[in-house]
Amino acid sequence: MVKAVVGANWGDEGKGKITDMLAQEADIIVRFQGGANAGHTIVNDYGKFALHTLPSGVFYHHTTSIIGNGVALNIPVFFKEIKSITDRDVPMPKILVSDRAQIVMPYHILFDQYEEERLGGKSFGSTKSGIAPFYSDKYAKIGFQVNELFDEELLKEKVYRVLETKNVMLEHLYHKPLIDAEELLKTLREYREMVQPFVCDVSAFLDQALKDGKTVLLEGQLGTLKDPDHGIYPMVTSSSTLAAYGAIGAGIAPYEIKEIVTVCKAYSSAVGAGAFVSEIFGDEADELRRRGGDGGEFGATTGRPRRMGWFDCVASKYGCRLQGTTDVAFTVLDVLGYLDEIPVCVGYEIGGKVTTDFPVTHELEKAKPVLKVLPGWKCEIRGIKKYEELPENCRRYVEFVEEQIGYPITMVSNGPGRNDIIYRESSLKNDK
């Protein structure tokens, strides 16, 4: 049985916590796309961790954590992350790496930085993790799969061939130092030694695991609005952020995915440039940013202050639809307890007309939020375990959002810890 955990919005929704929680019941957790460009923050008995490449299940003894073929694998970051958890008394997790996963090369990170410099004010707000150059090479068929590290002759020929192109760009477009082929080969041989114990045919492993009745959790990165096809293009990432891609990025059949848990925040936040209709500014944004998340709303990868906004029903309804949502996990509800009133974006006004459908980018940039103001609950809700024990206005907020987005909210997160979760029945669950 396969479940996916994915984001409805811009990322930063709290997927790491939800995956960490659901991993208690899973046998295998798979990262199926993206790279070290986005982080998952997890708070558990070992402490607080920001993971970028490792799946969120690495804290459990009973699970196998998998880097799927769809991942952009930065090998040094991967091993630095393993060390960062084992240095804090987390037992060495069981990890497998797909032999078909592709490697983030050292020059991908350089090219990412150089291109952002070249674009200046027209840049895409990259985390400079090498992701766009990595995927450009993957689809230009000049990327390096993990399995290619183990064929010395092939590796050498390919390095020299690829660097012919890269060095022309470095010299004539970016005016930067050239890459030495032998130095790069030396680095790749080091990568080979590091990764060798973990490499296997992940697709075959998962096929057998599913035949054996194992539970598999697919862990997505970022959210619907960062998807290159369905997101706010071009302010998107370079790999699909949708649950549908989980089948491709893990190497399993699409029909195996039975449940899709889409994570929504009780307010909105985003890192990087692009249209953000419900965005707030000034003191109002600073206050929400300071109180938000776990220790403030700052990017887990870059440390950049996140842009803040009210909950966006239009974007979230769209995000849930594209994901194929069976359940919504509604996170960081506890953060809003300081507010007398809570605005919610229920529509977009574009050219004098109001819509509840999420538009394409050039229309989105003209959109103004249509807000409905709900009463706050003005109290602390951490520690509450039963939905009916939440303050009435808090329940009304959850139920209003559920009605607007049209997908069942079956989990409500009211704190950063693994067990700060409230399960609820939803009448929409039976309708889906």
Describe every region a protein language model picked out:
Residues 1-432:
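Non-transmembrane, aqueous-exposed alpha-helical and coiled segments at domain scale
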